[in-house]
Amino acid sequence: MSVALAGSPAINATQYEPLRVMVVDDSVVIRGLISRWIEAEPDMVVAASLRTGLDAVNQVERIKPDIALLDIEMPELDGIAALPQLLAKKRDLIVIMASTLTRRNAEISFKALSLGAADYIPKPETTRESAGAEVFRHDLLQKIRHLGGKVRRRVSAPSASAPMVARVREAAAAPAAPSVASQAALVKRAFGPTAPRVLLIGSSTGGPQALMSLVAEIGPVIDRYPVLITQHMPPTFTTILAEHLMRAARRPAHEGVDGELIKPGRIYLAPGGRHMRVTRQGGQPAIALDDGPAVNFCKPAVDPLFTSAIDVWQGGIMAVVLTGMGSDGMRGGKDIVAAGGSVIAQDEASSVVWGMPGAAANAGICAAVLPLNQIGPKLVRLFSGDRS
């Protein structure tokens, strides 16, 4: 039996053992709701449903979960205090932080990412609002499935010389995404002939840490050119991310404002809940925020940014697709390449999830597929005139 959520790869549930999920939340209502969602999926099970971080720390070695969904605000031991203790006891544990959309919780979520959490998910203020609960369900199951791809256990026949279960890595990307060993074969395009005049970046799962690392390395690019970023992230979280990017880059960074003129020396981040597009205002490049429907199940989405920029910069676009689930950015990347621009994708080994960059690489649109720590230096050279 194959299962998939929209934007997720199909998983043959009969070939893999179910992912073991530990749900840690002080709300019995939330624990019950999430547990029912998980148990309804054939490729995952609830390994434990616990009330506090202390319960999780005391029982994680016995439970042996693959993934922990960890609430931030709990009695006895909260999520941020429990996180390092859980990872110390089970180093391969994948932790997803869960919190409501407050500034304090957004800041704590960013701290959790720096301490080793794999991702975060915003909880709805109330589960009685059906639309909000459905979005939460969709996003949660998608994250579990994609992040769990790295530890999913393939079912094998009993053998005297082999264990029942072998750990295998399954790329959380498009079904045909190539392995790390074959990535060199994907690089088939030369960089576009036009000197880049703008840097566009798209990212999702694992993106905040990747973005902070990248912008810290591209100061010479930011000083001379505008940088526009779409990170899949809700409101409040993008506000905090912009502040972190400003500190990492030591250059101005803020959420894009509708009608704002785009200038070199600044980083513009798509605000949560709005698509960020590029338009012209009085002949000058400007931000246009769009409150339309989600694109690729995301809002903000990368494709609207990528595609809209072509009318302004034509072939002078350098686009980077970083770690993330799904395939957002691939279609926009195709449009950029068709217009004479260039695309770089993060490689699988350095990605938390090789979905978005894998889709771009597999589509044959990339001029380079690089580890994260090589993308910054490459961009500095490219924007300095080195087209090799």
Swiss-Prot record:
Its PTM note reads: Phosphorylated by CheA. Phosphorylation of the N-terminal regulatory domain activates the methylesterase activity.
Quickly give the catalysed reaction: [protein]-L-glutamate 5-O-methyl ester + H2O = L-glutamyl-[protein] + methanol + H(+); L-glutaminyl-[protein] + H2O = L-glutamyl-[protein] + NH4(+)
Name the residues annotated as catalytic in the UniProt entry: S204, H232, D328
Q: Does the keyword Magnesium apply?
A: no
Where in this chain does the record put each Response regulatory domain?
20-138
PTM sites of type 4-aspartylphosphate: D71
Similarity remark = Belongs to the CheB family.
> What is the name of this protein?
Protein-glutamate methylesterase/protein-glutamine glutaminase
What organism is recorded for this protein? Rhodopseudomonas palustris (strain HaA2)
